């Protein structure tokens, strides 16, 4: 999104099919070697227990927290155009000949149609985005907290040796505290200067957002008898929602959880091994995103 054009379209009530400004087109990102980056620093805290209630059975539980300062990442093209909009709003349409917005957003000169369209917007007219200089920067403090559960069971039978393993990861907190320009955007939105419909991406509560699912499960079972070994495994990733899309009724676009199963068969020789494997046995397709 070019949120300068988006804001103009919203306040003027423009027809979505008008072709003078395009706020939903793609934008090129240009990056160069980042300078003056600070090293990321993290503090890790964890507590765990280990239980062995039966011979061959081990159960583990670990709760952990990771706080990382000076997290390195991208401010984001959408956030850059939102900051460009904020500077334009603060300027109030004054002295447009000398107005300079966000220097990271490089635009074409506005043509006469765009200038005429901006006349009733209270903003200085700007042309379409050519590209956005979006270099890596130290963004914020990121905090992730969760719990890992592990169950391991090994036992022998007359039919062979069995090994079962389950690992579950449950994320309770994934938060990124804003800093710098992003903190300025948050304050502007809280004050009402920026419209609430403009999403500020990459900060705040990120759990369940854009691939940050809150749980993951892996299950692995192995049977071995003499030179033969068969292993089956499953991987389940939890659901999340895609912030850039909404359904027609305004609700979130949810991406459901996904489970895949794998199978391998191996035969062991004295100094070699033959192994046949099939990943995603059921040919499960990833959910639409």
Identify the function of each model-found stretch.
Residues 226-228, 257-263, 268-274:
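A short pocket-lining beta-strand/turn micro-motif at the edge of beta-sheets
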Residues 64-244:
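Gram-negative outer-membrane beta-barrel transporters
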Residues 244-253:
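Short, surface-exposed loop/helix-turn segments at secondary-structure junctions
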Residues 58, 67-69, 172-175, 234-245, ...:
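C-terminal beta-signal and adjacent terminal beta-strands/loops
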């Amino acid at each position: 999104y070019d949120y300068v054009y988006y804001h103009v379209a919203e306040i003027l009530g423009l027809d979505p099919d008008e072709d003078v400004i395009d706020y939903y087109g793609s934008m090129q990102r240009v990056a160069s070697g980042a300078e003056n980056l600070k090293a990321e620093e993290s503090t890790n805290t964890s507590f765990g227990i280990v239980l062995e209630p039966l011979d061959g059975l081990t159960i583990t539980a670990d709760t952990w927290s990771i706080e990382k300062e000076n997290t390195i990442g991208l401010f984001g093209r959408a956030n850059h155009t939102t900051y460009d909009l904020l500077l334009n709003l603060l300027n109030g349409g004054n002295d447009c000949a000398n107005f300079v917005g966000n220097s990271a957003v490089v635009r074409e000169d506005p043509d006469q149609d765009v200038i005429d369209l901006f006349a009733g917007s209270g903003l200085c007219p700007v042309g379409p985005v050519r590209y956005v200089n979006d270099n890596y920067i130290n963004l914020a403090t990121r905090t992730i907290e969760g719990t890992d559960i592990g169950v391991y069971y090994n036992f022998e039978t007359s039919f062979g040796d069995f090994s079962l393993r389950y690992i579950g990861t449950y994320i309770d907190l994934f938060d990124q505290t804003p800093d710098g320009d992003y903190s300025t955007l948050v304050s502007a939105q809280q004050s009402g200067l920026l419209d609430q419909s403009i999403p500020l991406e990459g900060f705040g509560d990120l759990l369940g957002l854009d691939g940050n699912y809150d749980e993951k499960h892996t299950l692995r079972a192995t049977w071995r008898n003499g030179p033969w070994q068969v292993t089956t495994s499953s991987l389940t990733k939890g659901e999340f929602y895609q912030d850039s899309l909404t359904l027609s009724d305004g609700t979130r676009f949810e991406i459901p959880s996904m489970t895949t199963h794998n199978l391998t068969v191996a035969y062991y020789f004295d100094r070699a091994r033959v192994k046949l494997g099939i990943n995603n046995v059921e040919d499960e397709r990833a959910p639409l995103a």
